[in-house]
């Protein structure tokens, strides 16, 4: 069998996968539109192909004759990745699971039907009737069913804010559909997990920080989260039930959830992919010691993942630069503890505009201690 690995995507969040695959001895064939992104030069072989043009993509991939296909942290790339895996005869998640994992309404329905705890919710389209909400309690939160990265998300404190929020969310949605839910109070977490042949392992829990209402753009992450062993076990059990309800069997899984003061574990959404924002690629190996990207590569090649730890676990953090104070803290860290900084992004100019989505952040840095 060849050692040629197809990787879909070329941006900075995909680049750690390219680097890790090369470290593991794979010849990396990276596919994506030519934009000058870092992965184009990091790849052993770069292919200027639109990954959403399935016919052309498959034609070019056949020429490579790869041992597998991988991609991380991208819902967009997840669809062509699974398409290629099916064509190559490598086990992967079903088309139904793929659809559920990329539609927040279908996801809620699957978990509700499996008896998993969650808020009241309803589908919102352009002909939405407020009569549906007569049994709902404010505050609510609305999200496009088909987007991630905080795009189109808004908290609604009262009926007065409802029309504006619906217009905002539907304006972002490609399908003109949104999900409206009762808002769950409590700290936010994600559980970085791996699945193989329908068996699951929670590698580490992430403690998340956001801008809060109304848009909840993530400002930083810490691993591992400060959970008691008893609560970790409860989270683990709840996560596995939720994964099974969606039919997830292969690859990385990124569930986002809140834990209420009463101890309820309520999901916000679950991605059948590695978490973005460097959570899976950078933080998980630092905090857990596991080779998360190596696991994803193995599964994408049809092989069982290894759970051997490759390094001693440390506390891992990522901090996003949004304000002048964030920038000052970063400069102080560089001056006083440069050894703690594991990676930093290019920095954009700080903006005075409101932070509405993840792309509005100026940059980030990752630390280990």
Predicted regions: what is each one?
Residues 94-105:
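A short, structured active-site edge motif that brings together acidic residues
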Residues 113, 130, 295-369:
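Peripheral (often C-terminal) accessory segments that flank ATP-dependent C-N-forming ligase machineries
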Residues 1-96, 302-306, 350-352, 368-369:
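ATP-binding N-terminal substructure of ATP-dependent carboxylate-amine bond-forming enzymes
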